[in-house]
Swiss-Prot record:
<keyword id="KW-0813">Transport</keyword>
<comment type="similarity">
    <text>Belongs to the cytochrome b family. PetD subfamily.</text>
</comment>
<dbReference type="GO" id="GO:0016491">
    <property type="term" value="F:oxidoreductase activity"/>
</dbReference>
<dbReference type="InterPro" id="IPR005870">
    <property type="entry name" value="Cyt_b6/f_cplx_suIV"/>
</dbReference>
<dbReference type="GO" id="GO:0009767">
    <property type="term" value="P:photosynthetic electron transport chain"/>
</dbReference>
<keyword id="KW-0934">Plastid</keyword>
<comment type="function">
    <text>Component of the cytochrome b6-f complex, which mediates electron transfer between photosystem II (PSII) and photosystem I (PSI), cyclic electron flow around PSI, and state transitions.</text>
</comment>
<dbReference type="GO" id="GO:0045156">
    <property type="term" value="F:electron transporter, transferring electrons within the cyclic electron transport pathway of photosynthesis activity"/>
</dbReference>
<feature type="transmembrane region" description="Helical">
    <location>
        <begin position="36"/>
        <end position="56"/>
    </location>
</feature>
<protein>
    <recommendedName>
        <fullName>Cytochrome b6-f complex subunit 4</fullName>
    </recommendedName>
</protein>
<keyword id="KW-0150">Chloroplast</keyword>
<comment type="subunit">
    <text>The 4 large subunits of the cytochrome b6-f complex are cytochrome b6, subunit IV (17 kDa polypeptide, petD), cytochrome f and the Rieske protein, while the 4 small subunits are petG, petL, petM and petN. The complex functions as a dimer.</text>
</comment>
<keyword id="KW-0793">Thylakoid</keyword>
<feature type="transmembrane region" description="Helical">
    <location>
        <begin position="131"/>
        <end position="151"/>
    </location>
</feature>
<dbReference type="GO" id="GO:0009535">
    <property type="term" value="C:chloroplast thylakoid membrane"/>
</dbReference>
<dbReference type="GO" id="GO:0045158">
    <property type="term" value="F:electron transporter, transferring electrons within cytochrome b6/f complex of photosystem II activity"/>
</dbReference>
<dbReference type="InterPro" id="IPR048260">
    <property type="entry name" value="Cytochrome_b_C_euk/bac"/>
</dbReference>
Length: 170
């Protein structure tokens, strides 16, 4: 773990800031009652008003009625399950697919132990966490977009289809 520097209480600048009440809360205002009684209810009521306003102005229409005799060609899950659906769809062994899905949170749990930094540092000074985030986001987007395509184009996203067609024609 990183070594944290203890504050020098003999420093006159620090003592002046602490005397003004700038130690724990930088602005010097207590959270009670200002924030909890006045600001939070306004934010909560504003959020509820925005939700009600959107529900009134843009109501969510119910789709066409279900027809049990006409099923779609491919059933897709909700958009936030697309990467998981793509993993299960492309991996031939279902147990391996489930193990891949379990390995994602297990791998993310190991990231804090790989870096020995202070938790308040800049993300650019934490290269492992930044790299894991960027690669994970790219892979999740790749899998999510691929889940909406047919199975033969899902891994390449249809980007290499022209080259494959040209090789078949030769």
């Amino acid at each position: 773990m990183g070594v944290t520097k203890k504050p020098d209480l003999n420093d006159p600048v620090l003592r002046a800031k602490l005397a003004k009440g700038m130690g724990h809360n930088y602005y010097g205002e207590p959270a009670w009652p200002n924030d909890l009684l006045y600001i939070f209810p306004v934010v909560i009521l504003g959020t509820i008003a925005c939700n009600v306003g959107l529900a009134v102005l843009e109501p969510s229409m119910i789709g066409e009625p279900a027809d049990p005799f006409a099923t779609p060609l491919e059933i897709l899950p909700e958009w936030y399950f697309f990467p998981v659906f793509q993993i299960l769809r492309t991996v031939p062994n279902k147990l391996l697919g489930v193990l891949l899905m379990v390995s994602v949170p297990a791998g993310l749990l190991t990231v804090p132990f790989l870096e020995n930094v202070n938790k308040f540092q800049n993300p650019f000074r934490r290269p492992v966490a930044t790299t894991v985030f960027l690669i994970g986001t790219a892979v999740a987007l790749w899998l999510g977009i691929g889940a909406t395509l047919p199975i033969d184009k899902s891994l390449t996203l249809g980007l290499f289809q022209i080259q494959i067609d040209l090789e078949i024609l030769r």
